[in-house]
């Protein structure tokens, strides 16, 4: 389970605005593991779950039909691809929204782990500490 601080209506609104801006300006990153015919649906899912959902709900909405069987090099797409993509995109737009909001409100931000781990890597722990000095 992920814990996103300040994931309220204001932050969600900024996430949606950032997504729409990327789409409008052709800057939206299209995950290469998603079949081209599902990209439009994926953008709609992102908007929907940015508005009312969480990573876990987005992940559940990404059915195996959305994904290619193999990457461009012929390697099998990992079984956890929905989880990976859901986290990557939700986290990316959440982080952007938090930064936009902090700038608008004249506040600072702190780095933290959104998902607690039983076996937290030392490198990860060190990076979080260094970023908050």
What are the residue ranges of the model-derived segments?
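Domain-core detector
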Residues: 1-133
């Amino acid at each position: 389970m992920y814990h996103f601080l300040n994931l309220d209506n204001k932050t969600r609104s900024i996430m949606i605005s950032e997504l729409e801006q990327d789409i409008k300006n052709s800057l939206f990153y299209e995950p290469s593991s998603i079949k081209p015919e599902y990209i439009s649906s994926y953008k709609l899912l992102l908007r929907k779950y940015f508005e009312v959902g969480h990573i876990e709900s987005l992940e559940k909405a990404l059915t195996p039909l959305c994904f290619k069987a193999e990457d461009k090099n012929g390697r099998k797409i990992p079984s956890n691809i929905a989880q990976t993509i859901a986290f990557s995109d939700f986290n990316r737009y959440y982080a952007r929204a938090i930064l936009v909001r902090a700038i608008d409100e004249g506040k600072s931000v702190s780095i933290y782990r959104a998902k607690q781990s039983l076996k937290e890597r030392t490198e990860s722990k060190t990076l979080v500490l260094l970023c908050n000095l």
